[in-house]
Structures are given as structure tokens and as C-alpha cells.
Amino acid sequence: MAKGIIIVSDPNPLGISHKLIAPTIKLLYSKRGLDCSVIDLYRDEFNPMATDATAANLIARHYKHIIKTADHIHFISNVNLGGVSPGLEGFFDQVLNKGFAYDVVNNKTKSRLHKKEVYFYLHHSKKMRTRFNAAWMRLKFSVIPTIFKSSTIFQSDLTWGINEVKSKKIKKIRNKLISKLFENK
């Protein structure tokens, strides 16, 4: 049975990550009888600056175990000043590191997580969203080829201004998630 994990890195518990994207993904899994759990890096007080020597890094070991057992991994992050959240950057450094997520053989990276289905959900303020922004480029040319080999990146600039616009955008995002997550299943 497939197992999903949702990793949320958004400090706002009332934001789109917690109120729309994560619940929608979790609902899709539960409707199909699949297990899906949520990791909230901010609620867990994950320290993106921790090192292997600190006691705070025990949580990184726990996250590694969860990643190992998951078939589908969903990363949700807001984009600040052109990059993913510091919590998610710390997660990449501490959890998805060399020796766990990939190895280097003859100066080439060899993924250990290449069989996982991976999805990234990035949401921006309207002013920062461009197709080829810094967060997208970091994932597309650094994180994904090294660790996962392939994945899907969703980008959104959802704003909470006008209710009619908000409803249309939410419906569009939800339909996109449904079609991408379970397109051939």
C-alpha cells in the first residue's frame, strides 16, 4: 500500500499551506484508502541551523526514517525573497544529505531516493512569481537531479483578496492537484 508524507514549511498556521494544500492532499489519500501523514517543520520546532553534533538533530534522524518509509513525498513551502523557506532549506541540508539521500560515485551523484514520487508546492506573493524564479531553479537544477531524479513542481500566487477570485483560484489548484496526483492510478 502506498504511503504519503506531506512536509509543510510555512510559519503561518492560517496560511494556504495549512488551510488548503495539505488538507486537500491528505483528503485525496484518505478517499483512496491510503495512509498520509503531515510533518509541520515549524510546529515541530525543527532547527534549520542544527548540526550532526547537536541534540536537536535527533529530529532529523526521525525525519529520515519517515522519508524512507514513504512512497510519495509532498513538500509545501512559501517563497520568500526568491527562495524556499529557511526551514525547508535546513531540511534539505540535514535530512536529504549525502549518505542518506544520495551518494557520489566517480564524481557523479547517485540517488538513493529515485523511486519516490515527489511533489513541490511553492506559493509566492504576486510580485515575486515568475516561471524561472530562484526557488524553482534551485529545485529544478540542484535538489531534484541530485536527490530525486524527477518530480513535479506546482507554483501558485494565490492571494486572499476578493472572494470570487479566491474561490476560482482554490478550485483551479484543487483540480490541478487531483489530476496530477492520481492521473493514472
Give residue ranges: language-model regions.
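A short beta-strand-loop structural module common to alpha/beta enzyme folds
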Residues: L34-E45, Q155-W160
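Glycine-rich phosphate/pyrophosphate-binding loop and the adjoining helix
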Residues: L139-K185
